[in-house]
Each structure stands twice: as structure tokens, then as C-alpha cells.
Curated annotation (Swiss-Prot):
Region called Disordered, residue ranges: 1-28
Listed name of the protein: Small ribosomal subunit protein bS20
Keyword terms, alphabetized: Ribonucleoprotein, Ribosomal protein, RNA-binding, rRNA-binding
Superkingdom, taxonomy of origin: Bacteria
Function field: Binds directly to 16S ribosomal RNA.
Pfam family membership, one: Ribosomal_S20p
Lineage: Bacteria, Pseudomonadati, Pseudomonadota, Gammaproteobacteria, Pasteurellales
Protein family: Belongs to the bacterial ribosomal protein bS20 family.
GO molecular function list: small ribosomal subunit rRNA binding; structural constituent of ribosome
PANTHER family in the record: 30S RIBOSOMAL PROTEIN S20 (PTHR33398), SMALL RIBOSOMAL SUBUNIT PROTEIN BS20C (PTHR33398:SF1)
Length: 89
């Protein structure tokens, strides 16, 4: 299982692995929401893109507040996608 011999080190290894899996799942979910907005923009559907953007914004902000991604990365995602949605006629 782990290379750790000390009980506390074994526990930390188990907790780290559990946290890693949870974070990976959260990161994947966030990326999916972002991709939905990009797909709507690529299709040229402004109303769908705006709805997807609102959902994506909530998720990205939540991930930033929990420390999964940096706040600036969240801001960059929101700014870039918002600009692309505004370009749609």
C-alpha cells in the first residue's frame, strides 16, 4: 500500500490520496462546465452560451474559493468567455 511505517504517516498518505481523487473529480467537473460554454460559443448560440456561462461562473468561483484553482485563473476564464459571448451577434 504505502511505504510509510509510522501510523501518522500512513494516515496522511491515505488522506492525501483521498483528497487527490476528490480534487481530480472537482477539477474535471469544472472543466466540463467550461467546455460547455466553449461549445455553445463555437455553435454561435448566444442564449445557450449565456446560460452555460452563468452555471460555469458559479462552479469556477466555488473552486477558486476552495483553493482548487487560483482566483486569477478563475477571473481569466470568466473574462475570456464573457468577451467571446459578447462578440456573438
Amino acid at each position: 500500500m504505502t511505504l510509510a511505517n509510522i501510523k501518522s504517516a500512513k494516515k496522511r498518505a491515505i488522506q492525501s490520496e483521498k483528497r487527490r481523487q476528490h480534487n481530480a473529480s472537482q477539477r474535471s467537473m469544472m472543466r466540463t462546465y467550461i467546455k460547455k460554454v466553449y461549445a455553445a460559443v463555437a455553435a454561435g448560440d448566444k442564449s445557450v452560451a449565456e446560460k452555460a456561462f452563468v452555471e460555469m461562473q458559479k462552479v469556477v468561483d466555488r473552486m477558486a474559493s476552495k483553493g482548487l484553482i487560483h482566483a486569477n485563473k478563475a477571473a481569466n476564464h470568466k473574462a475570456n468567455l464573457s468577451a467571446q459571448i459578447k462578440k456573438l451577434a
